[in-house]
């Protein structure tokens, strides 16, 4: 009998913002509060980096003073209460604090086990930008979608 250290089974494919393993994740609920700025592309879409404001709400990206606390989780339903493809200010959202998630790497291809970075103004995950501590690429995208990757994060 083979010993296993982790019984979380990886899923074969998914969409950005979906949890990629069926156990071993820490997810918390928060209220989203932000001002959408189209020039910054700070859409609160699944797989964006979020920060914790002093009032206990979260917002995509980072202002530089608040702690980054996780990755915005989405699922296969229409994400916003108002039927948009992104979350709106006032929506209750789930944030992955630790675990595995499918994400998009904007602006280039990912390298296996590379550090994950993000863009402060939008919260997009990238291979350049601000460093995300304890965030690594676990699986690189397939030929048909090279920007879709599996990420491991731990913001605890």
Model region roles, listed by residue range:
Residues 1-156:
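Surface-exposed, low-hydrophobicity beta-strand/loop segments enriched in small/polar/acidic residues
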């Amino acid at each position: 009998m083979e010993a296993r250290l982790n019984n979380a089974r990886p899923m074969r494919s998914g969409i950005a913002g979906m949890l990629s393993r069926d156990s071993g994740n820490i997810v918390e609920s928060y209220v989203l509060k932000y001002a959408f700025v189209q020039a910054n592309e700070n859409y609160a879409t699944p797989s964006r980096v979020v920060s914790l404001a002093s009032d206990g709400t979260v917002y995509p990206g980072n202002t530089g003073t608040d702690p980054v606390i996780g990755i915005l989780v989405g699922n296969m339903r229409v994400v916003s209460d108002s039927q948009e493809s992104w979350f709106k200010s006032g929506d209750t959202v789930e944030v992955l604090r630790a675990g595995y998630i499918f994400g998009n790497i904007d602006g280039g291809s990912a390298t296996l086990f590379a550090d994950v970075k993000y863009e402060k103004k939008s919260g997009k995950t990238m291979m350049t930008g601000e460093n995300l501590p304890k965030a690594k690429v676990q699986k690189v995208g397939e030929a048909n979608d090279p920007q879709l990757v599996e990420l491991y994060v731990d913001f605890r």
